[in-house]
Amino acid sequence: MSQRDTLVHLFAGGCGGTVGAILTCPLEVVKTRLQSSSVTFYISEVQLSTVNGASVARMAPPGPLHCLKLILEKEGPRSLFRGLGPNLVGVAPSRAIYFAAYSTSKEKLNNVFDPDSTQVHMLSAGLAGFTAITATNPIWLIKTRLQLDARNRGERRMSAFECVRRVYQSDGLRGFYRGMSASYAGISETVIHFVIYESIKRKLIEHKANSNMDDEDESVKDASDFVGMMLAAATSKTCATSIAYPHEVIRTRLREEGSKYRSFFQTLNMVFREEGYRALYRGLTTHLVRQIPNTAIMMCTYELVVYLLNG
C-alpha cells in the first residue's frame, strides 16, 4: 500500500466516524446512563403482588424513553450532547487509526493466508482494534465521565479539562486507562463485525457482476450500491453487538469516578451477583438503535470518501 493510499484510508475513516458521532450523540448519552451503576438514581419502585395477596416494592431500572425523558426534564436538552467534544476529538483519530491499521494488516496478511479469506479479515480486524483502543482509551474515559456527570438545570457542568485534572489527581496516568481491559474483550465484536461485513460486501459485488446492471442508468447503479453497503454495515453490526454487548456495560462501570469496580472479571462477577444477568444487557436496545445508523453512516461515508479520492 502506497503512502497516498494509507492517507486516503486515514482521512476516510476519520470522516466516517465524525459524521456518525455527531448524528447519534443523544442516543450515546442515554445508553451510557443506562449501563452505569448511577442508573439507580433514576430507579423507581414497582408494586408486585405476592402469592398471599400482599404487595412488595421492587426496584425497576428505567427504559430508554423514560431515561431520555428524565434527562430532558432534570438537565435540559444540552445534556444529550455531553461528551461530544471528546467524542469528536477522539472519533476521527480512532477511526482513522483503525481503518489504516485494518487496511495495512489485510494487505500484509494476504501474503501469508489465502487472499481475503476469513482468517485475514479476523486477524486484520483484531489487530486494528487493539491498535486503536491502546492509542485512544484516555479520550473515551473522559467522554464517559462527562456523559455520566448528571447536573440539574442551572448547575455548573464539569468541563473536559476539569475532568482530566480530576482523573490525574485521583488515579495518576493509570487512571486514563481504566476500562481498557473491557475494550480489549470487545475486540471480538469488531472481528465478528468485519468478517460478516466483508462477506456480505463480497456477495454483493459478485451479485452485481452476475446481474444485468450494466444496462441500468448510472444513478440507479450508484443508489443500489449505496443501499447494499448500508444493509451490509447494519446487518453485520447488529449481529456482532448482540453477541458481545456485556463488555460495554463492564467498560462503563470500570470508567466511573470513584468506582468500586477494579478489573474486568471482578466487575463482571459483581454486576452478575448484585443485579443479575439482565444488567449485563442494560442499554442494549438503545445501543442497537444508535449503532445501526451510526455504523451504516460511518461505513458508507468511509467507502464514499475512498471512492471519491481514488477517482
Curated annotation (Swiss-Prot):
Each Solcar repeat occupies one of these ranges, namely 4-108, 116-203, 224-308
Entry keyword annotation includes Transferase = no
Any Pfam family matching the protein: Mito_carr
What keywords does the record list, in alphabetical order? Membrane, Mitochondrion, Mitochondrion inner membrane, Repeat, Transmembrane, Transmembrane helix, Transport
Any Gene Ontology CC annotation: mitochondrial inner membrane
For this protein, the record's InterPro entries field holds: Mit_carrier (IPR002067), Mitochondrial_sb/sol_carrier (IPR018108), Mt_carrier_dom_sf (IPR023395), SLC25A33/36-like (IPR049562)
State the species of origin: Danio rerio
- Coiled-coil stretches are none
How does this protein sit in the membrane?
Multi-pass membrane protein
Q: Which GO terms describe its biological process?
A: mitochondrial genome maintenance; pyrimidine nucleotide import into mitochondrion
From the Swiss-Prot or TrEMBL record, give the protein name.
Solute carrier family 25 member 36-A
Q: Where in the cell is it found?
A: Mitochondrion inner membrane
Question: Which sequence ranges are marked TM in the entry?
Answer: 7-27, 41-57, 111-131, 180-200, 226-246, 291-311
One GO MF annotation is: pyrimidine nucleotide transmembrane transporter activity
The keyword Metal-binding appears for this protein: no
Report the family membership.
Belongs to the mitochondrial carrier (TC 2.A.29) family.
PROSITE patterns reported in the protein's UniProt record: SOLCAR
Annotated Gene3D superfamilies: Mitochondrial carrier domain
